[in-house]
From Swiss-Prot:
SMART domains: TPR. This is Magnetosome protein MamA. The gene is mamA. Induction: Part of the probable 17 gene mamAB operon. Residues 113-217 are annotated as: C-terminal domain.
Amino acid sequence: MSSKPSNMLDEVTLYTHYGLSVAKKLGANMVDAFRSAFSVNDDIRQVYYRDKGISHAKAGRYSEAVVMLEQVYDADAFDVEVALHLGIAYVKTGAVDRGTELLERSIADAPDNIKVATVLGLTYVQVQKYDLAVPLLVKVAEANPVNFNVRFRLGVALDNLGRFDEAIDSFKIALGLRPNEGKVHRAIAYSYEQMGSHEEALPHFKKANELDERSAV
């Protein structure tokens, strides 16, 4: 595990921030400032890495987020925000098992955190753990009924579990949020097909093809 950020600008910013903090302490009490310099350094470093790592994750700079957040993650002093964003960064950089483990720890620590439930539910769909995804995404959909991605992925999970009626219901809610989303029409059609309802499937297949042709123009 690296002990330094990969970006030189981050390092310069960190020590500038540290220098300003020490300067303020020197103005108040020079002796105490020198005595506490090393502890201040550690405290500022931890806060800086945490904030910068979360910022990287939110901006989609997942490799940079991993470098920063690994410095501050502590399994014994659990910080849900750090674990959540480090978990996301792990998943996005291919370390899916490590990311899922952190997200599961996060939901155990904060079961009512909708953000954590959303990310973990979507991750479960990604890794095809559909039975684990459904209860989380149902909870999230109830809390945030206009989230298209949650409604669509909930439909995907239900469809893969053979719960086609429920899947179609979820897909139709997603379709109400984005009426011209071809993949939703196609998903509804496939669910109907698996139920043997060919007549119900046909208009959705046609609509999906029509939307695909329109987007290709």
